[in-house]
């Protein structure tokens, strides 16, 4: 019998959650992570599955995700503990045939359940599947320190925030030319914040929750982690720059245009226009 904890997807989740905790982005039970899988990924590990998988209904049906398996972090679970006990802190779930709920196939032992932000994740997965023709498979939410800090001092506007991050580090425009979506402050763990996040995910691979954290989407765990890491690095630079009295010089609009042309990306027009 193959051990599912040695699979690429469990090992990938262990690395991503451990790295995020070491970055300081996921204190206590902060943050959540979901990865969309294929049946072929989990097929070799059926012998590891629960004999009687628990079924949990979704608060709203998501037919686009019907019959789709995911690996997810658990509600109330600490990222720092995933590496110590993957089966207690992670779970593999599979949405049922009509998208009305899901079965917990593996993990989430001792009656644990998936992250409370699962509605936001699933709704965002739906939008990123449509926006990227199925390419994006990961949704990651974390409490990236400097990005959160900037939501207290910058205007919480997509164009303004995006332009500042682009100017904070040259690679940012290349990594997220589609900019950063921003929500108003909302109560977490609700369908409402999930729907608002998904709406922004139609246009942006990064979405900020002011005074709370960030959502990122990408095709792989590495790409999604790297996306957030890049934005957070720029935010860290900006925090230092602002604390030293602000910018004396920066990357100009013409230089940002040249950067986009060199790397074949189309920058968010509203941010470029500022």
From Swiss-Prot:
Its EC number is 4.1.2.19. It catalyses: L-rhamnulose 1-phosphate = (S)-lactaldehyde + dihydroxyacetone phosphate. Its cofactor is Zn(2+). Gene3D superfamilies: Class II aldolase/adducin N-terminal domain. Keywords: Cytoplasm, Lyase, Metal-binding, Rhamnose metabolism, Zinc. Pathway: Carbohydrate degradation; L-rhamnose degradation; glycerone phosphate from L-rhamnose: step 3/3. It is found in: Cytoplasm. Binds 1 zinc ion per subunit. GO terms for cellular component: cytosol. The active site is at 117. GO terms for molecular function: metal ion binding; rhamnulose-1-phosphate aldolase activity. Disulfide bonds: none annotated. CDD domains: Aldolase_II. Catalyzes the reversible cleavage of L-rhamnulose-1-phosphate to dihydroxyacetone phosphate (DHAP) and L-lactaldehyde. This is Rhamnulose-1-phosphate aldolase.
